[in-house]
Design a protein with these regions (language model features):
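Gram-positive cell-envelope targeting signals
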Residues: 1-57
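Cleft-lining beta-strand/loop regions that shape enzyme active-site pockets
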Residues: 14, 43-48, 130, 139-141, ...
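PDZ/PDZ-like domain segments forming the peptide/carboxylate-binding groove
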Residues: 29, 66, 110-151, 155-159, ...
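Acidic/histidine-rich, surface-exposed loop or edge segments in extracytoplasmic proteins
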Residues: 58-66
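Extended, small/polar residue-biased N-terminal targeting/export presequences
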Residues: 67-128, 176-178, 184-191
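Conserved small/polar residues in nucleotide/adenosyl-binding loops
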Residues: 365-367
Length: 367
């Protein structure tokens, strides 16, 4: 199974074997660094004049002159841009079409239209239901944990690709989507109404002994607000220690991470990004507020990206112990830049680390 890149974007989305691609399809199907700069076509025009692109121009001319029917120039360009980025062989870099980019932005904000399930992508490219939200459209339609989504409106999900499948299942609130599922060898058809749903990415409770427990499933645009409400309530209720559960948290936005770390760490620079020319940039900093409670972070092999930086920051600043299994080991950062077509490029641009530690990319956070 593949893991959602939930590439830590700048705003902080897989290397070895890409872990389970997880998303909140709400279906609960990821910045601060989304750079809204429309320079893509200008870059292409400059490159197109270079000799190394001569064969590509020849190929395009041959196709235009000899293909047996009309060529859809827009579709060809979209495919070419996807292929160009795919040639980097980087699972975190991708080109998104306009529709895919809109779905991406909605998901990263923590607000989406969907059916109320959490899914993972199988090796075959289908979507397996990991959790069905209570009182969600999916639950009302009879969907169950373990169901495999294979088709949407008659189209094969594996052929649509991950982003295409999410986009097809989502849609306008109040409309109905037809899904084909596999359950214990049987094929079922379900009609599910799409609804507006807010993704819950932070939740918590008080455990025995006045231990505050906070589960963070990802770092979305709405995560800091959810986290702060839980954190404040636990502290006000007299928590004597805090546990942060980041198991299976694939990461998310650095802007969300920074806001969550702010009340926990001392004032100053917390994490930096290092670019290929050796220059550095402050990624995370904190003000003078600092949590004095004992803290513990729980992690596993699917704890990645922003979730790893959260863990490393608390550990390296001596604020928390870490328990569980070694983490995934993703210490590289992506930025997402909009393109003139309405699509977007997500590109790996830097490594990152805490100011008190070393970059752990591919080296894991060991327990």
């Amino acid at each position: 199974m593949r893991k959602q890149s939930d590439a830590m974007q700048e705003d902080m989305p897989k290397e070895k074997t890409v872990p389970v691609r997880k998303s909140t399809l709400i279906l609960l199907f990821c910045l601060c660094g989304v750079l809204a700069v429309g320079t893509g076509l200008g870059i292409y025009r400059n490159y197109a004049g270079n000799t190394e692109y001569r064969e590509l121009r020849q190929l395009a001319a041959t196709v235009k002159q000899n293909y047996y029917t009309d060529v859809d120039d827009e579709a060809v360009m979209q495919g070419a841009m996807k292929g160009y980025v795919a040639g980097l062989d980087d699972p975190y870099s991708q080109y998104m079409t306009s529709e895919e980019y809109q779905a991406y932005q909605t998901e990263e904000a923590g607000q989406t239209v969907g059916i109320g399930v959490t899914v993972t992508q199988t090796d075959e490219g289908y979507l397996q239901v990991e959790e069905v939200n209570a009182d969600s459209p999916a639950e009302k339609a009879g969907m169950q944990q373990g169901d495999i989504l294979t088709k949407v409106e008659g189209e094969d999900l594996a052929e649509l690709g991950y982003a295409g499948a999410l986009s097809k299942i989502r849609g306008e609130a109040g409309t109905t989507v037809q899904l084909t599922i596999q359950r214990n060898g049987d094929t079922l058809e379900l009609d599910v109404e799409r609804q507006n749903i807010e993704v819950t990415t932070a939740e918590g409770q008080m455990l025995d002994g006045q231990i505050g427990y906070i589960r963070i499933s990802s770092f979305k645009g709405n995560t800091p607000e959810q986290f702060q409400a839980i954190y404040d309530r636990l502290v006000q209720d007299g928590a004597k220690a805090l546990i942060f559960d980041l198991r299976d948290d694939g990461g998310g936005l650095v802007s969300a991470l920074e806001k969550i770390l702010d009340p926990l760490l001392p004032e100053g620079e917390i994490a930096i990004a290092t670019y290929r020319d050796g220059t550095t940039k402050t990624l995370v900093e904190s003000d003078a507020t600092e949590c004095s409670l004992p803290m513990t972070v729980i992690v596993n092999g699917n704890t990645a990206s922003a979730a790893e930086l959260f863990t490393a920051s608390l550990r390296d600043f001596g604020k928390a112990s870490v328990v569980g299994t070694q983490t995934f080991g993703k210490g590289i950062m992506q930025v997402t830049q909009s393109m003139p077509s309405g699509g977007a490029l997500t590109l790996t641009v830097a490594t990152y680390q805490t100011t008190k530690g070393e970059c752990y990319h591919l080296s894991l956070i060991h327990i």
